[in-house]
Amino acid sequence: MSQSVESRTRIKSERYESGVIPYAKMGYWDADYVIKETDILALFRITPQPGVDPIEASAAIAGESSTATWTVVWTDLLTACDLYRAKAYRVDPVPNVADQYFAYIAYDIDLFEEGSIANLTASIIGNVFGFKAVKALRLEDMRMPVAYLKTFQGPATGLIVERERMDKFGRPFLGATVKPKLGLSGKNYGRVVYEGLKGGLDFLKDDENINSQPFMRWRERFLYSMEGVNKASASAGEIKGHYLNVTAATMEDMYERAEFSKEVGSIICMIDLVIGYTAIQSMAIWARKHDMILHLHRAGNSTYSRQKNHGMNFRVICKWMRMAGVDHIHAGTVVGKLEGDPLMIKGFYNTLLESETDINLPQGLFFAQNWASLRKVVPVASGGIHAGQMHQLLDYLGDDVVLQFGGGTIGHPDGIQAGATANRVALESMVMARNEGRNYVAEGPQILRDAAKTCGPLQTALDLWKDISFNYTSTDTADFVETPTANI
């Protein structure tokens, strides 16, 4: 028996009247929404178009990143639409900025495929960033529920196992990127690796854009690099490594290169962020299976993470990459040549290293996060750093980091090995001073000068680079406090 007209009318309600109605009226705004433990939460910075109410703009973002389209569709009635609609539940004005708002949005966990960064991002950063109702949109932070995190592998190796494997404790790891990054022959490339490791570094590294070019094919680079690693390890009596970049055009090529890196004895391989989320997860699974450390270079991230009003904050990338399963990720230096506000970088490092984080608005952490026992990712600091900044680096970044001195090693006038030695002595003298209870931050320059009295390479480095720094105001700074961005 067919439904009566009266019954159909009751079911339709105002929400399902045909045509275009506001997103907030369609159910994508709910100021009284009670957050579930299993909800995925997102915090967007929105800049509505003139005349667009911020609540309606927030509801539109919630709708377009979950189930909505531009008009009412009756097929919503065939779904558990009240459950599957994302709900914007809170809108706050951004402090000290006109016409920008923080929009809090909750998503039911069943909107997302288990263990898939690609599926998560297809919704959260999909079509919404081109939506006309907002002039600009930025994803600032997310909270992943424990139930969702448990569907991800997490870091292939993790900080604790990496320290055990490297037999390095109580200090940062030391590394360097081979320079020039492009153009060297395989034999010369391998010699750079050897000299850096022989001088005292723990790691040498391929750069993001060295893959398999005419001047040096990948297999040649791998063989010569590992020859340098093995000779330096035997000479120093220490475990050392070189990040072999396996980034390639296809997954088949990447697996081939990764397999070869394992065959020739490497303990670590490397990929670039630009290969995409599915490829990153695939390589992390491979690395876990083959007992390899997996380094991720964040190549390309600043195209969408640097501008404050549009794109995506790097802390979100940190969260996704911890879920995806990388062991290292470049996360800023504070004092180097690349973008890096001190508080923002502290938030990045805490996201990668802590088992649980609380809300910390000065660091940009809008949600408390329990990491469900996923392993820790080692942050990497690289780009424009040198031995004379060692006290600042140790103060800002702590022990659980890889300090990579590329130009600060290879640019040493007495040679690569001397540059590496300068960095190793600078680090060990600073760690010793700290462990003795000295105020190593205030006394840092004097500690370095004292160490240089018995280390010629360090004295040369201090004379050459002195207090060189890159004092530019960061574009991505805290919204809730003023922070220094100069290298002081």
UniProtKB/Swiss-Prot annotation:
Q: Which UniProt keywords apply?
A: Calvin cycle, Carbon dioxide fixation, Chloroplast, Lyase, Magnesium, Metal-binding, Monooxygenase, Oxidoreductase, Photorespiration, Photosynthesis, Plastid
Binding-site list for substrate: 127, 177, 181, 298, 330, 382
Name the reaction it catalyses.
2 (2R)-3-phosphoglycerate + 2 H(+) = D-ribulose 1,5-bisphosphate + CO2 + H2O; D-ribulose 1,5-bisphosphate + O2 = 2-phosphoglycolate + (2R)-3-phosphoglycerate + 2 H(+)
Q: How is the cofactor bound?
A: Binds 1 Mg(2+) ion per subunit.
Q: Does the keyword Metal-binding belong to this entry?
A: yes
CDD domains per UniProt = RuBisCO_large_I
Specify the superkingdom.
Eukaryota
* NCBIfam families documented for this protein: PRK04208.1 (NF003252)
**How does this chain assemble?**
Heterohexadecamer of 8 large chains and 8 small chains.
Q: What is this protein called?
A: Ribulose bisphosphate carboxylase large chain
Q: What is the lineage of its organism?
A: Eukaryota, Rhodophyta, Bangiophyceae, Bangiales, Bangiaceae
